[in-house]
Amino acid sequence: MVSDDLRRELAAPPAWMYPFELADGSRPPLLHHELPSVHETRALMMERVVQDALEAGDGEPTAIDIGCSEGWFAQRLASWGAAHVHGVDVRDVNIRRAKLVRDHYGVDPARITFEVADVLSLDPDTSGTFDVVLMIGLIYHLENPIGALRIARGLTRGLCVVEAQVTEQNAPITSGVGVTDEYEQLDASWAAKFEPAQDFHPIASHGGVISLIPNLAALVQAMEVVGFRDVIVLEAPSGHNRQYVNGQRRMVVGYA
């Protein structure tokens, strides 16, 4: 049975990020037709390493989904073995939808909790640490992606999974070094993109900012610099979403 509140949310803008299958067989209207393939590929790429990290934790394993949107991956984390999952997102509408869908599926609200919060406001001293931290589709919408990764590192006691759109700037960039006619070659680089207000760009995590988009070298470098060890780039199997197979989007994991 689909509640009246959920039906109203399904009929209201903006369109949804995740293709939840509801009890009556219906699905929300999506922002883009490719999204189901994107999410399926993401889940396939991370499931095994996430399960391993949850199994390796002491006591009841916990996870946090930073930039959780409507809570699809928060629910996956629970199905993969997390005893408690906390989802945070900067948008009220996303958290409202996440709670409605959680309740629709009959999930204990104490097992999957949701909170409206900015990633930069999170503090391990108050929230604690987690066996698994997800940052899926987030950092390339931020003005301070490295600061966000530092916070993610502080929250991680096991594994952190970061997924991002990346640039195709794989050749080194030439930069001056402060001396006339002297230069250095830098493998890591970030592209700047203006994100319009959220009302006009519903996929963006936060509108009205200059977002920084890394190339793969910059993403790996940032993970290492903020303190993750054994940083690994996960590869997508052939036959799955081409953005991942072709390297337009990458998934990187690091350990505490």
Q: What does each model-found stretch correspond to?
A:
Residues 76-116:
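Class I SAM-dependent methyltransferase SAM/SAH-binding core
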Residues 37-59:
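Conserved alpha-helix/loop element of class I SAM-dependent methyltransferases that forms part
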Residues 138:
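Hydrophobic adenine-recognition pocket in adenosine-nucleotide-binding enzymes
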